[in-house]
């Protein structure tokens, strides 16, 4: 007999029924939908290759399947952890990683065999139960062709949605395995403020509890008062700084007699305290788990602990329920407890437990080796995880530990490139093992390294409104923010070949830098899909789609490509993501007409499924006229701001002749080093439409040819040149060229003249350097520094 009880994978059994037809013949029954046709021979018993056939419907990607058919093109899912891995190779087992199969395949179909999986019972807090009929068949067959996005959304229909994390999860997390004290943590936070570096989450590793014999160990549940003499006041200090905190847990050793909460737990479990016996960790024991939450963890949550970091150290399988994965089950238990007992959104950070764990959000990928190989592998690993909806991997940015035999030096270039990539991952969190050389605090770096590292965090916060909108898409449709290229370009061979390249949401393409620089530049081969042009954000270059191209980047540049014409809502400078009323900078990228629907909600309540708001922003271009519209906000949620400050930022923009806002003439600022027009809309009610009309002249020089990068590289090279020759006096041409971007800001009315002069001077750079009378070595160095090409 078939069971309709929810399983670990399929939590929804009562599903919407698609349109279908049935042909009921004497020997067979045929069920047809728009995507497939199922044919079964009656009276033949369990499904086998002899009695069941599923074929694609007309017009669909062709396939024929019978039980036992092996997929040839599975696009893979993820793995439990990166512990001990350098790239895809484990330095301890000397085995290469074999990613689990995912939900998607180039074959166009997937079978999920759920027959052996555990079920949930129907108790008030649903609990694990084994299947009564061990030989039953519980299958889900998905036919999707190459419509991968449809497959993922369909999976959420029966397997559940990916919960929307609280907004603060998309800020910067500071984490380090280090025996921090209360005072050191305060100094750390002060330094973040001093250097104007945003911060949302502080992670405290296992030294929050006692770790020495007789007091603690890997497992611990009692605050170490040598380091934190007053935990409540420490947590209160963090709250006063709008910070969230998570504590590390290694739960495997249960509750020892030396723990503060041991007497309460012993009484709860009926253990004789006189025997001083350890209370074992058994996650399947509902009474034990209720005691752990109510007696041990809940008091700390009430003090101010926001969520828990479930680190590895529990046994692979439960001690009482045979074959029950401790990782899978502990993730469910902790997350569902937060669902049941908190007013705020549940969030957990943990290792992957298997299919169905997408319902418990944030992943902790573990202890990866510090190396370029590890950085090179992580984009592919992260992208593939979206194929099982595990779209929120949190990596130890910069790597966790050195490999035995490696020189223990923190390579600033490797860390910088990892941080730049980390800013464009689901969760931005630095971490490392307890090693005195792994000082990843940004203020330990100098010059371009500090600039690039700090800018990576600032860029992350700029992107927060876009990222949060994409997180809502993950909840609605099952599409992760970091997704392989084949989701959008399933018929392009390059979408499968360029494994590290990915879409970061709907509008942004990222081609990570995963190798060291040569002669001060990183060269990356980038595939730009056809269908639209692409704006290389960091250099201000508009590139044609439908090509594979090599591009070079300095340390402070990174290959991020925005679909031409995109409209992206961004933040300016923010302290963190605690506030819900920050001004929005609506960025308009060069290209054709574009639009974006900005999403907002309370940020941390549990009512986001129905309580939220959206604002549509769009552009219309006609010859030399640009219209930008910020539509009226639709929807509502708790504590929603009634009005908001908007600014319009037009990238690659010339100087306008006129600007109006809702028919009234308006002023503007010009940002010379970005070639960007900035228009401030007076703060108005969010439910009012705002229309900005921008009229340009008919004579506009080419602006999206990389001149922004030329400005920046030239200025940096001039600054560095002064340290090579402190007595240098710049010629008028060299001085004017270096000052172009600031001159544009000061004197935008000279726009055409300044741009034309810069381009002329830049094209004549060898002659300018001769006029400057630089020696041969400095001339060659300068040309390389600016990346000059004829």
Question: How does the language model describe each region?
Answer:
Residues 560-665, 672-674, 678-689, 693-789:
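Accessory, solvent-exposed terminal regions and/or long lumenal/extracellular loops of proteins
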Residues 8-10, 64, 198-453, 488-490, ...:
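Aromatic- and carboxylate-enriched substrate-binding clefts and catalytic-loop regions
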Residues 151-179, 199, 718-728, 732:
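An acidic-aromatic substrate-binding cleft motif
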Residues 5-19, 271-272, 536-555, 658-682:
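Solvent-exposed beta-strand/loop surfaces of large extracellular or lumenal domains
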Residues 12-166, 176-177, 182, 189-194, ...:
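Catalytic and substrate-binding clefts that recognize carbohydrates or anionic sugar/phosphate headgroups
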Residues 35, 102, 192, 238, ...:
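Conserved, mostly hydrophobic/aromatic
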Residues 335, 340, 355-363, 377, ...:
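Catalytic core of carbohydrate-active enzymes
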């Amino acid at each position: 007999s078939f069971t309709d009880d929810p399983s670990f994978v399929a939590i929804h059994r009562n599903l919407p029924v698609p349109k279908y037809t049935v042909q009921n013949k004497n020997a067979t029954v045929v069920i047809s939908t728009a995507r497939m046709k199922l044919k079964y021979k009656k009276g033949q018993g369990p499904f086998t290759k002899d009695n069941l056939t599923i074929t694609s419907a007309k017009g669909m990607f062709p396939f024929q399947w019978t039980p036992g058919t092996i997929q040839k093109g599975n696009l893979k899912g993820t793995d439990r952890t990166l512990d001990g891995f350098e790239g895809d190779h484990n330095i301890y087992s000397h085995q290469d990683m074999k990613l689990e199969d995912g939900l998607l395949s180039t074959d166009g179909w997937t079978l999920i065999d759920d027959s052996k999986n555990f079920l949930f019972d129907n108790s008030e807090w649903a609990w694990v139960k084994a299947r009564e009929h061990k030989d039953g068949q519980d299958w889900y067959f998905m036919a999707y062709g190459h419509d991968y996005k449809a497959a993922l959304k369909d999976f959420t229909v029966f397997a559940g949605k990916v919960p929307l994390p609280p907004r603060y999860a998309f800020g910067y997390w500071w984490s380090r395995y280090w025996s921090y004290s209360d005072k050191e943590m305060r100094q750390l936070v002060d330094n973040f403020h001093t250097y104007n570096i945003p911060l949302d989450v502080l992670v405290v590793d296992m030294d929050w509890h006692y770790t020495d014999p007789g007091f603690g160990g890997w497992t611990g549940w009692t605050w170490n008062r040598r380091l934190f003499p007053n935990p409540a006041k420490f947590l209160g200090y963090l709250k006063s700084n709008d910070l969230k905190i998570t504590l590390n847990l290694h739960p495997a050793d249960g509750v020892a007699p030396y723990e503060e909460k041991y007497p309460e737990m012993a009484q709860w479990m009926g253990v004789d305290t006189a025997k001083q016996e350890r209370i074992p960790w058994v996650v399947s024991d509902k009474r034990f788990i209720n005691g752990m939450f109510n007696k041990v963890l809940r008091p700390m949550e009430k003090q101010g602990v926001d969520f828990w970091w479930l680190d590895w150290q529990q046994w692979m399988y439960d001690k009482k329920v045979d074959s029950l994965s401790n990782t899978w089950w502990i993730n469910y238990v902790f997350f569902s407890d937060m669902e049941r007992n908190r007013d705020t959104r549940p969030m957990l950070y943990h290792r992957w437990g298997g299919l169905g764990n997408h319902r418990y959000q944030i992943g902790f990928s573990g202890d990866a080796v510090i190396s370029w190989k590890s950085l090179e592998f992580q984009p592919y690993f992260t992208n593939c995880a979206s194929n099982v909806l595990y779209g929120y991997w949190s990596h130890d940015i910069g790597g966790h530990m050195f490999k035995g035999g490696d020189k223990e030096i923190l390579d600033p270039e490797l860390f910088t490139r990892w941080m730049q990539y980390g800013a464009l991952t689901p969760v931005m969190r630095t971490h490392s093992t307890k090693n005195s050389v792994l000082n990843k605090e940004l203020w330990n770096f100098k010059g371009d390294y500090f600039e690039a590292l700090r800018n990576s965090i600032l860029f992350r916060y700029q992107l927060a409104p876009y990222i949060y909108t994409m997180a809502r898409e993950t909840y609605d449709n099952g599409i992760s923010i970091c997704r392989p290229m084949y989701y959008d370009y399933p018929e392009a061979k390059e979408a499968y070949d360029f494994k590290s390249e990915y879409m970061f949401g709907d509008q942004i393409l990222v081609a990570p830098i995963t190798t060291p620089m040569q002669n001060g530049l990183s060269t990356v081969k980038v595939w730009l899909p056809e269908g639209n042009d692409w704006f290389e954000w960091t250099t201000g270059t508009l590139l044609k789609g439908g090509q594979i191209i090599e591009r070079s980047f300095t340390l402070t540049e990174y290959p991020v490509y925005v679909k031409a014409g995109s409209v992206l809502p961004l933040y300016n400078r923010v302290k963190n993501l605690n506030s819900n009323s920050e001004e929005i900078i609506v960025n308009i990228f060069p290209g054709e007409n574009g639009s974006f629907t900005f999403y907002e909600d309370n940020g941390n309540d549990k009512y986001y499924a129905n309580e939220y708001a959206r604002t549509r922003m769009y552009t219309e271009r006609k010859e030399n006229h640009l219209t930008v519209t910020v539509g009226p906000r639709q929807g509502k949620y708790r504590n929603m701001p009634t009005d908001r400050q908007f600014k319009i930022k037009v990238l690659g923009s010339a100087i306008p002749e006129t600007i109006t806002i809702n028919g009234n003439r308006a002023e503007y600022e010009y940002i010379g080093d970005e070639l960007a027009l900035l228009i401030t809309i007076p703060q108005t009610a969010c439910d009012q439409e705002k229309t900005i009309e921008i009229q340009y002249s008919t004579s506009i020089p080419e602006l999206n040819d990389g001149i922004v990068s030329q400005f920046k590289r030239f200025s940096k090279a001039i600054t560095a040149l002064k340290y090579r020759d402190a007595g240098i006096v710049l010629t008028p041409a060299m001085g004017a060229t270096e000052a172009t971007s600031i001159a544009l800001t000061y004197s935008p009315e000279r726009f055409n003249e300044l741009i034309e002069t810069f381009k002329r001077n830049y094209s004549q750079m060898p002659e300018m350097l001769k006029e400057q009378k630089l020696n041969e070595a400095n001339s060659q160095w300068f040309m390389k520094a600016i990346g000059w090409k004829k």
